[in-house]
Amino acid sequence: MPLMFAPVERAMKVIKILADEKTKKHLENLGITIDSELRVLSSGASVIVLVKDTRLALDSGLASKIFVVQA
């Protein structure tokens, strides 16, 4: 499922990122890669996620390109 539809406060695992290489590299620098785990803290116009003890805000366009499953 796209990250923007992931349930709040559940551990999720990234399985696919549908973005260009520049965006994938940016996400990698933030700690979001295939097989990485994250937790959605809130969602709406932007999605707030917790990745390795760091909170990140992702706009809904980017969050729709990150696919996750429950970890």
Regions flagged by a language model, labelled:
Residues 1-71:
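Compact, glycine-rich, soluble single-domain proteins
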